[in-house]
Amino acid sequence: MTQQRPTRTRERKKTWTAFGNLGRKPTDYEVVTHNMNHTMRGTPLELSPTVHANVWLKKNRDEIALKVDSWDLFRDPDRTTYDTYVKMQDDQETYVDNLLLSYTGEGRYDEELSSRSLDLLSAGLTPTRYLGHGLQMLAAYIQQLAPSAYVGNCAVFQTSDALRRVQRVAYRTRQLADAHPARGFGSGDRAVWEKSPDWQPIRKAIEELLVTFEWDKALAGTNFVVKPILDELFLNHLARLLHVEGDELDSLVLRNLHGDAQRHARWTAALGRFAVEQNVNNRTVLRDAIAGWHETGEAVLAAGAGMLASRAPSADAAKIADEVRATLAQLHANAGLGHDA
């Protein structure tokens, strides 16, 4: 009688081994994001280690003070993917298109805007095409050096949002130029951006950020200080003032764009919190980096709040500045970087 050999059960390798021991099936968000940054290795790019791009990545990303063992553990609180982003922003663009059609499709909406509304628009809206391009380049740099696709994707969607903002401002600029050719909408905006005293502290801040190359310092200066101040000034507070002056269209468009800024603040706070949870020393690193931009942020805030208040009788520069500081403090607290943390 021959004995049958016992059948050996072969343990099947899990499909999602790259995720480690998740204990669950990864989400669609994780599948299309996890471990997608191909530069996180000894030599970032498949070129000579001495090639400028490799030296740059090593110096400005891999050798910075902000340290986390695995950036792939970070998660965007909104779990945004390309698919969900496109659908979400398609809805937002449809909303803005309908606003424009509703207000300016027929009648003389722009021609009937008050002089105070036009003053606010020429000072604080149409020159922001240049500001938006600066913010777009800053977000793109944060994305390029991001140590994980989970982080980089957040920044790339922020980059796209900045372009959306530029496009919407440019569209309104053209409409306002047609309605008020003597006002200099469009034709005079570059001079305002480059020469108006109100804008120079802001322009200086953007230009200084554009030559800040260490990733942690660029992130801190952009997303933890300068950008949130600018978003509150020229999206939130400008929207409020235009509403008071009777320009409901531009107020609503800016409030819609402010929704993008709030999403940027969510992922920024989540990233700060994650970095501190992964390495307690990162709290000091980020606080120091933020402190390095404090004086610049205050100059931006004083210039922007003064610009808006000088063109709207209902506004008070000190009150605007205090409200923006409170929003900024809340962002830092949400990131685990507040004074009580």
UniProtKB/Swiss-Prot annotation:
Q: Which InterPro entries match?
A: Ferritin-like_SF (IPR009078), MP_mOase_hydro (IPR012078), Phenol_Hydrox (IPR003430), RNR-like (IPR012348)
Gene3D superfamilies found in the cross-reference section? Ribonucleotide Reductase, subunit A
Q: Does the keyword Cytoplasm apply?
A: yes
Instruction: Give the main location.
Output: cytoplasm
Entry's EC annotation? 1.14.13.69
Q: Which reaction does it catalyse?
A: propene + NADH + O2 + H(+) = 1,2-epoxypropane + NAD(+) + H2O
Alphabetized, the UniProt keywords read: Cytoplasm, Monooxygenase, NAD, Oxidoreductase, Plasmid
Q: What up-regulates or down-regulates this gene? A: Induced during growth on aliphatic alkenes (such as propylene, ethylene and 1-butylene), epoxides (such as propylene oxide and 1,2-epoxybutane) and chlorinated alkenes and epoxides (such as vinyl chloride, cis- and trans-1,2-dichloroethylene, 1-chloropropylene, 1,3-dichloropropylene, epichlorohydrin, and epifluorohydrin). Repressed during growth on other carbon sources.
Q: Where are the transmembrane segments?
A: none
Spell out the subcellular localization from the entry: Cytoplasm
Q: Which class of enzymes does this protein belong to? A: oxidoreductase
Name of one Pfam family that matches: Phenol_Hydrox
What the record says about activity regulation is: Inhibited by propyne.
Molecular function (Gene Ontology), one example: alkene monooxygenase activity
Tell me which GO cellular component terms the UniProt record holds: cytoplasm
| Protein family membership | Belongs to the TmoE/XamoE family.
Q: What does this protein do?
A: Component of the alkene monooxygenase multicomponent enzyme system which catalyzes the O2- and NADH-dependent epoxidation of short chain (C2 to C6) alkenes to their corresponding epoxides. Also able to catalyze the oxidation of a number of chlorinated alkenes, including trichloroethylene, cis- and trans-1,2-dichloroethylene, vinyl chloride, 1-chloropropylene, 1,3-dichloropropylene and 2,3-dichloropropylene.
Subunit info here reads: The alkene monooxygenase multicomponent enzyme system is composed of an electron transfer component and a monooxygenase component interacting with the effector protein XamoD. The electron transfer component is composed of a ferredoxin reductase (XamoF) and a ferredoxin (XamoC), and the monooxygenase component is formed by a heterohexamer (dimer of heterotrimers) of two alpha subunits (XamoA), two beta subunits (XamoE) and two gamma subunits (XamoB).
Task: Give the protein name, as stated in the record.
Answer: Alkene monooxygenase system, oxygenase component subunit beta
Give the organism the record lists.
Xanthobacter autotrophicus (strain ATCC BAA-1158 / Py2)
Give the gene symbol. Answer: xamoE
